[in-house]
Amino acid sequence: MESVLRSGGTTAEDVVLNLVSMDYNELLMAPSGHASEKALDDMNAEDHILVVNGSIPTGENGAYCTIGGKSAEQVLLEAAEKATAILAVGACAVWGSVQAAKPNPTGAKGVDEIIKDKPVINVSGCPPIGEVITATLTYVLTYGKTPEVDAEGRPKFAYDQRIHDSCPRRAHYDAGQFVKTFDDEGARNGWCLYEVGCKGPSTFSPCPIVQWNLKSGWPIGAGHPCIGCT
């Protein structure tokens, strides 16, 4: 949500107030308690687009996360039943992320590990790019169908190129100019970060093109190697 709030183009408030009907969101909705649960039940009774962020803890019969007396998994399954499109937003919702790392005591899972009877659009990233989230929603609303996805379930219109292909440091890679340590001359001169762990050559994402915070920055632009979060 923070990523969307700080995205460019159409503002988050314009999307929420003028373009879509956001019927249930724990962070933005005004109702609480029984009123919020009624809003969720009302939404589940009609066709809707479901956007999920965060992994789903399934261990101990769902005891690690309950909402209105229901496990997070049960809430997800009920919300997905009449959903015309399902978006898993962020690395946690897509793959379970850090919470799903061994030994994974909470049994955290990504959305498509639980929803098996419908396609799930994976908008990956930590955080995901706000413009990609709104672009995916706009595609579904405009065309009445889900966008074409890659082998990982990500929209091809956003995840069809490697970070390496559009990286402003690519010329240094081609010239064999690599940062060896974060305080060396290469680091100060903006050389390629591949030899200090950059995953840009194998990571598909529009990060170098869209960036974050009104296009004011992104990890490699700040001197940190890509960690491959998408």
Predicted regions and their residues:
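Extended hydrophobic packing segments that form well-structured cores
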Residues: 212-230
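Iron-sulfur-associated redox domains of electron-transfer enzymes in respiratory
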Residues: 1-197, 201-206, 219
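Short Cys/His-rich Zn2+-coordinating modules
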Residues: 206-212
